[in-house]
Design a protein with these regions (language model features):
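Short, basic/aromatic-enriched C-terminal tail that caps enzymatic domains
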Residues: 225-237
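A short aromatic-anchored loop/beta-hairpin motif
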Residues: 1-90
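Cap/lid and interdomain-hinge subdomains that line or gate substrate/regulatory clefts
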Residues: 80-129
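Short, hydrophobic/amphipathic alpha-helical packing segments
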Residues: 28-37, 123-130, 202
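Active-site beta-strand/loop microenvironment that shapes enzyme catalytic pockets
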Residues: 119-170
Length: 237
């Protein structure tokens, strides 16, 4: 059963070992760490980290983010990374590695489930993955790593697409209102065109909490560098 959930972006700029001591977007990192800390405070039996990758799979919970995935020699700030007992794994999807990094920074040592969802996963399959995660343990906290559109400005990775604002607003409205089922109706083709890579992960979230009453606190919402990032804490009533 899902007892709490958090939504964070799968953004490499969160990771201190990649950016240095001073956060590139300090408010974003602080919001993510606060959301992850709240997950741990719910005393889960396990924390399931969900992120988008090339294919759906369950990954070794002892694997950690490999900074060299982003650039050889990318670790710019000396630190004891990865933590004891974890192995840097270049095959681990970055979204899951970044999620694990956030958990480690927040000192959350509950058992972990690392679950990727394919970038082209249909909505019903995403929902089924979410339902399976919800039944994995008696008390499961869910950390969803997902980005909105990367076409928010002319300097965005995908340049400006005027449709991106309305699309991202529909996602945020579903999160804020607690009407997560609306995420299952997102247009996958439009999400792809807008480079909103988080679409499948949002739909896993909806499947995991289908039929549950939730309240949400959006801790951060902005589009630095033209990419929509949202951080939210979702509390199950």
């Amino acid at each position: 059963m899902i007892i709490a959930a958090a939504l964070c972006p799968a953004a490499p700029l969160l990771v201190r070992e990649l950016t240095g001591v001073h956060p590139v977007v300090p408010d974003l990192r602080a919001a993510c760490l606060a959301a992850v800390a709240e997950l741990g405070a719910a005393a889960p039996d396990a924390i399931a980290v969900v992120g988008v990758a090339d294919y759906a799979a369950t990954w070794n919970a002892g694997w950690a983010l490999d900074a060299a995935v982003f650039a050889p020699g990318a670790q710019r700030h000396p630190s004891p990374w990865p933590p004891d007992g974890k192995k840097p794994a270049p095959d681990l999807p970055p979204a899951l590695g970044i999620g694990g990094w956030l958990l480690d920074q927040a000192g959350r040592d509950a058992d972990r489930i690392l679950r990727s969802v394919a970038s082209d996963e249909p909505a019903d399959s995403c929902a089924n993955i979410g339902a399976a995660l919800a039944s994995a343990r008696e008390r499961v906290a869910l950390l969803v790593m997902a980005d909105g559109s990367a076409r928010r400005t002319r300097k965005a990775p995908g340049y400006l697409d005027d449709r991106s604002v309305a699309f991202d607003a529909s996602v945020q409205d579903a999160i804020r209102s607690g009407h997560l089922d609306a995420l299952l109706s997102l247009d996958a083709s439009l999400a792809h065109e807008l480079m909103a890579t988080g679409r499948p992960a949002w739909q896993v979230l909806a499947g995991a909490l289908r039929g549950r009453k939730v309240t949400s606190d959006v801790r951060y919402s902005d589009d630095p560098f033209g990419v929509a990032y949202m951080v939210a804490s979702i509390r199950v009533r």
